[in-house]
Amino acid sequence: MFNRLRMRKEKPSKSETISTATTTVIQDAAKDNKKLILDNSRWERRLQKELMSLIKEPPPGVAVDEDSVSQNLTQWIINIDGVEGTLYEGEHFQLLFKFNNKYPFDSPEVTFIGANIPVHPHIYSNGHICLSILTDDWSPALSVQSVCLSISSMLSSCREKRRPPDNGIYVKTCNKNPKKTKWWYHDDSV
């Protein structure tokens, strides 16, 4: 597979996007004068569009780690803050989104990463999230932003910080990719 992401140092005069039939160049003067050159395929164009939207107008408490995205368009780190007035107020979390070339027809792989994995009845201690829109209920109409809002809402509605009852056995026996898990969605009351 070809490496579709290359970085070059140059001196741009301002932020701009230059497109041709096969390549997009995103040039940002504010970010170390780097150029991001990407081959244009449908899934990459969709990711670029979602990324620009999320950077320009992020939902409250959600921010893209732009350094992670500049390294690899197929893996995004998203920072999420606990909503004020909830059990997670003042806490900071990180989500890792992994995309494949079937996106948006195939859902991204989404997990919590880092030292602070939320203690929640639908979040396992390894960062896997039991949320139907990440697997069975995924639709190409959904986006990274809608996933972030769903996860933020899931955290905000939680009434008790506790792990799923099967956390211990699941973490020991699960696949590394949570999308390969056959989830049973039986509890929407947390």
Model-derived features with residue positions:
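UBC/E2-like fold recognition across ubiquitin and ubiquitin-like conjugation systems
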Residues: M1-H92, N101-V190
